[in-house]
């Protein structure tokens, strides 16, 4: 079967010439960032969702509650969108000139004589760290966990946070299938249709305020008060 234009564009975006096998039926997404909508919250703010990161064998890891990282049991349902990462081409760990500030903190914790950690090694360290973190949707959430992993891996020279991670998934995430599109977009469409019919401009204004407040919180908490949003 020939490669579609979408397939080719996605490969170019992530730098893959031969992507690892993805199997949505078995929930296997090797070296991927994965996303699924959150009940109720995503119905009002569709670009907000739950994210996880996958091991090399495709098993999903996601920070789903206080001191709890799910393994191979993605919270809130099946994966709807994903981004596969070429770990060899995307990592800049070996480039000292491209080292991001956050990575220095992680490297100081490790023995300089140890061999360079693998993808799964980095995910294991982040998992162990977040098993001692309290969960808070506003300050320490699933996006914090995935950003922590990406920084350990020095993906795209690091500097990952909840804002640029959410932006990446929103604009670069690839839909798993048509069912995933319907599952993600139909509930917001229904809610907004009913809300506009019943509430009119009041409903639109309320949703707009909610979007501005949530977006503003994470942007200000990430870039103005850097200790507020944990990574």
Swiss-Prot record:
Record-linked InterPro entries: TMEM222/RTE1 (IPR008496)
Compartments, record wording: Membrane
Spans through the membrane: 33-53, 180-200, 201-221
Domain of life: Eukaryota
Biased composition (Basic and acidic residues): 102-119
Keyword Membrane attributed: yes
Region annotation (Disordered) ranges: 92-119
Gene Ontology CC: endoplasmic reticulum; Golgi apparatus; membrane
Keywords on record: Membrane, Transmembrane, Transmembrane helix
Coiled coil spans: none
Record membrane topology: Multi-pass membrane protein
GO biological process: positive regulation of signaling; response to ethylene
The protein's name in its UniProt record: Protein RTE1-HOMOLOG
Organism of provenance: Arabidopsis thaliana (Mouse-ear cress)
